[in-house]
């Protein structure tokens, strides 16, 4: 008989536990005691309480402070359970995710205790002795407040350093449930992933690890399969004449792979292995000649192959069956020492990938609410931003298969953190055992996904240990380093050696080098946001930037829907509550001030300028780093998404609305990026050094090729000898240059560079060649006619290549003598009838035009962010969710704003 799985979705209830020994929050509201509520499973108790009207939405206004009692209380989920084996030998209770500290019982008889949100559990119900009929038993999952479990562990481990006054390091639970510098505190409990009954006989497929490689054009799938045999039947359960133990049977494993070949055919290949009674599994290898390869987006197709794994008797009866998709590709990360330090080069199918990534946080603080449709919407947005890598950050969870399947389909590479973030973690029991179990479980579970290329030991823990002086508080107590340097890499190597493991982010490749060193592997650039202006991103060229970001509030409608302050200002209570970063409002103001001046108390002005500053700051970093390839091989912006309406570093807010940053990232992450930057003296070439010993493998380290920057407007000099430091060539030299990064192809085109005054009048113009014989960076030296301005407050430099544009402002915007923007706006219905096409035609220089249809209609969206137009130019905006009745509002402030208007209003106020 084939394994039968019955998911337990219906018939659940949840209630507060009040037995005298359990925890009940002191501020428990009326109406909660003694109430039994219908429960959603998979789910968490917050949603059930909210649905029943017993809990206000924690994300609305300042309700967060009124909902903390939920996480401080104990909760019990119950339902009736049928444990009839129905002819099978085994009946297992399978819990794919329990959040977090739970006692399970059947008719009051204990089953097990759990204490880890991040792993799966399976319980043999034959071991639970109960009486009475098999179809009316009560299953109870009683969840204890995570705070009390954390308190018990903390009492044994002692106080350990961390960023917040919350005990998340002491319990294996989503850390950001306890709040973060972008997140509210909502400590959840509940069966957050499916609960099921599985009935089976003889044996089942216990674990499947499909590890792929490519050898001489042939796809190779090594499927590591572990079996569990049923064992003897207990307690006299009747199963007829079945073989009751399965221990003496030979079994057969069959693996079938079908999918595309390089020439467009569909192929099917099959292999099998016989498993004797003394064996608990086998490795079944399937070779697929001429298999089409899986590539990251932008580098090729995402060829996926269907895999079917069957466990059969020798007579061919199917006992268990699994199916999934995988992709054939080789993948790794090169970190061998070169002339500039240690690179961090993500390599897929032998090609170094120009990584343009986004950091992912949990998309909801009630993480069970995130379904496949939500994942798809967010990941589609990442694709639309032209990202090719998503880093799953270590304060969240290992996401569901839906997330990784969608990344597989979209060609989004995945960097997966183990869930350790920004704190010291105890290494003694019971946490150590839980870490081992969860790591083994998830490394195996996710091994089928071709998108997954990096496992990372932790987020910032080693770096913060050094810079924040944790050693003084810790003394000689272990604090997690053993996990990152020993335990986790050992598990990855044993369970899935096909994946690259990095110790931390940031990490320099060696304990002897400062973890966040710009010349070695991964770097987090947070000093800029926290302390200085964004032009300091240009101070260095890290090898790989795995975190950096700049804050802005959510889209206007999202902010207005979440906060009801009247009047609403940047400093009104609700707006401030929806800002969780330390000194966050002051840092926003500090970012605006040097470039735009003070935003004052006007919310419209503040909202516009913070959005513009976020986009400009991120552009400064990305342009600088990407145009210094191959010294820098990747940029991963913090962050893609949000889990509640908040001022944060996100490009997409919690309602799914795109900030202007999202549209700017489309430009910055394009395969071809045009930037105007200060003249750079950085030697971007990296040269191989004599073969060294790779300290991770003990063998020879791979060599890294030199990829020099092409100088197309100069005399063809080589990096490091370009004459830029020659005083005889410095007179009247342009302080800026055009840099063009082409990630996928060579180039043979021109860039049009104009120096214009603020009315839009052309003062000088040059057309300069841009030629690359392969992917790389072209640096275009500017003649003084266009690169040197006569009036720093009254001129700008504009570079155009095809449809791509870069603008250089010689002085801060606050000092520029911007003139009133003059333009004409016309509307027409979209061909699909779902909105309007807005065409704006400029009669003057129009700087940073922003259209915000969500200020007119809740469903309003726009396909562009900030735009700069020269006289005579036109731009088309596609607006959805609005209609002809909205036209007047769409062409009026504040739905349509330009920089000159915003700054002029502030000057008028200051002069009044």
Give the residues covered by each predicted segment.
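Loop/turn elements at helix/coil->beta-strand transitions in domains of secreted/extracellular proteins
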Residues: 353, 385-389, 408-413, 448-453, ...
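Secreted/periplasmic carbohydrate-active enzymes, especially glycoside hydrolases
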Residues: 1-389, 541, 627-628, 632, ...
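The substrate-binding groove and active-site-proximal loops of carbohydrate-active enzymes
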Residues: 181, 296, 359-371, 387-396, ...
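Substrate-binding clefts and catalytic carboxylate motifs of secreted carbohydrate-active enzymes
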Residues: 16, 190, 455, 502-515, ...
């Amino acid at each position: 008989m084939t394994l039968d799985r019955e998911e337990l979705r219906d018939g659940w209830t949840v209630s507060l536990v009040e037995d005298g020994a359990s925890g009940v929050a002191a501020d428990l509201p009326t109406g909660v005691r003694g109430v039994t509520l219908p429960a959603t499973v998979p789910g968490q108790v917050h949603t059930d309480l909210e649905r029943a009207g017993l809990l206000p939405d924690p994300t609305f206004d300042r309700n967060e402070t009124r909902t903390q009692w939920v996480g401080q209380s104990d909760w019990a989920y119950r339902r009736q359970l049928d444990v009839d084996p129905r002819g099978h030998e085994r009946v297992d209770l399978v819990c794919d995710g329990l959040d977090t500290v739970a006692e399970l019982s059947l008719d009051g008889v204990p089953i097990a205790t759990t204490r880890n949100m991040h792993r799966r559990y399976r319980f043999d119900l034959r071991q639970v002795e109960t009486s009475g009929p098999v179809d009316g038993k009560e299953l109870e999952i009683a969840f204890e407040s995570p705070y009390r479990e954390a308190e018990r562990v903390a009492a044994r481990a002692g106080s350990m350093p961390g960023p917040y006054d919350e005990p998340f390091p002491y319990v294996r639970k989503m850390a950001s449930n306890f709040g973060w510098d972008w997140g509210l505190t909502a400590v959840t409990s509940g069966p957050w992933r499916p609960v099921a009954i599985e009935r089976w006989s003889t044996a089942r497929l216990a674990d499947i690890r499909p590890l792929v490689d490519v050898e001489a054009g042939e796809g190779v799938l090594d499927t590591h399969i572990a079996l569990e045999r049923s064992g003897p039947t207990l307690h006299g359960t009747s199963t007829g004449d079945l073989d009751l133990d399965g221990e003496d049977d030979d079994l057969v494993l069959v693996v079938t792979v079908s999918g595309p070949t390089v020439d467009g055919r569909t192929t099917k290949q099959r292999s099998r292995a016989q498993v004797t009674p003394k064996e608990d599994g086998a490795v079944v290898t399937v070779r697929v000649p001429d298999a089409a390869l899986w590539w990251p987006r932008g580098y090729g197709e995402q060829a996926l192959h269907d895999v079917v794994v069957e466990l059969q008797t020798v007579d061919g009866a199917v006992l268990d069956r699994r199916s999934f998709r995988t992709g054939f590709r080789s993948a790794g990360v090169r970190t061998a020492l070169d002339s500039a330090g240690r690179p961090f080069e993500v390599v897929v199918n032998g090609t170094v990938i120009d990584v343009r990534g986004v950091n992912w946080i949990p998309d909801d603080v009630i993480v069970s609410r995130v379904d496949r449709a939500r994942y798809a919407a967010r990941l589609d947005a990442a694709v639309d931003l032209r990202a090719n890598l998503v880093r799953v950050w270590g304060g969240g969870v290992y996401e569901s298969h839906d997330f990784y399947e969608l990344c597989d389909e979209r060609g989004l590479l995945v960097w997966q953190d183990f869930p350790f973030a920004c704190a010291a973690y105890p290494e003694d029991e019971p946490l150590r055992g839980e870490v081992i179990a969860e790591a083994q479980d998830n490394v195996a579970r996710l091994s089928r996904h071709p998108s997954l290329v990096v496992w990372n030991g932790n987020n910032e823990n080693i770096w913060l240990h050094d810079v924040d002086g944790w050693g003084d508080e810790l003394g000689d107590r272990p604090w997690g380093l053993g996990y990152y340097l020993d335990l986790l890499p050992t598990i990855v190597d044993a369970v899935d050696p096909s994946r690259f493991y990095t110790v931390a982010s940031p990490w320099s490749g060696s304990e002897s080098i400062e973890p966040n060193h710009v010349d070695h592997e991964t770097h987090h650039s947070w000093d800029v946001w926290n302390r200085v202006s964004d032009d300091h991103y240009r101070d260095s060229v890290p090898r790989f930037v795995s975190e950096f970001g700049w804050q802005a509030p959510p889209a206007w409608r999202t902010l207005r829907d979440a906060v009801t302050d009247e009047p609403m200002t940047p400093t009104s209570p609700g707006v401030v509550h929806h800002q969780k970063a330390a000194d966050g409002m002051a840092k926003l103001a500090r970012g605006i001030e040097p470039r735009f001046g003070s935003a004052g108390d006007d919310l419209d002005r503040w909202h516009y300028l913070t959005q513009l500053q976020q986009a400009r700051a991120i552009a400064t970093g990305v342009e600088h780093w990407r145009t210094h390839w191959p010294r820098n091989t990747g940029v991963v912006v913090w962050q893609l998404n949000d889990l509640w309406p908040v001022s944060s570093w996100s490009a997409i807010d919690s309602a799914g609305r795109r900030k202007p940053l999202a549209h700017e990232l489309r430009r910055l992450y394009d395969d071809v990026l045009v930037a105007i930057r200060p003249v750079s003296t950085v030697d971007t070439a990296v040269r191989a050094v004599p073969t060294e010993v790779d300290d991770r493998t003990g063998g020879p380290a791979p060599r890294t090729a030199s990829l020099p920057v092409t100088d197309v407007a100069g005399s063809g000099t080589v990096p490091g000898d370009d004459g830029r430091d020659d005083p005889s060539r410095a007179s009247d030299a342009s302080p800026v240059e055009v840099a063009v990064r082409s990630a996928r192809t060579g180039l043979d085109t021109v860039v049009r560079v104009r120096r214009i005054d603020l009315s839009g009048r052309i003062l000088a113009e040059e057309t300069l060649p841009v030629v690359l014989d392969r992917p790389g960076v072209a640096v275009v030296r500017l003649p003084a006619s266009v690169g040197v301005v006569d009036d720093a407050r009254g001129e700008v430099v504009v570079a155009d290549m095809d449809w791509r544009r870069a603008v250089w402002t010689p002085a801060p915007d606050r000092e520029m003598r911007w003139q009133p923007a003059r333009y004409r706006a016309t509307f027409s219905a979209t061909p699909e009838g779902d909105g309007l096409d807005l065409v704006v035609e400029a009669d003057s220089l129009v700087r940073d035009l922003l259209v915000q249809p969500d200020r007119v209609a809740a469903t309003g969206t726009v396909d562009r962010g900030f735009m700069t137009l020269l006289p005579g130019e036109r731009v088309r905006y596609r607006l959805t969710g609005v209609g002809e009745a909205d036209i007047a509002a769409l062409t009026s402030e504040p739905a349509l704003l330009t920089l000159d208007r915003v700054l002029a209003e502030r000057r008028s106020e200051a002069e009044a």
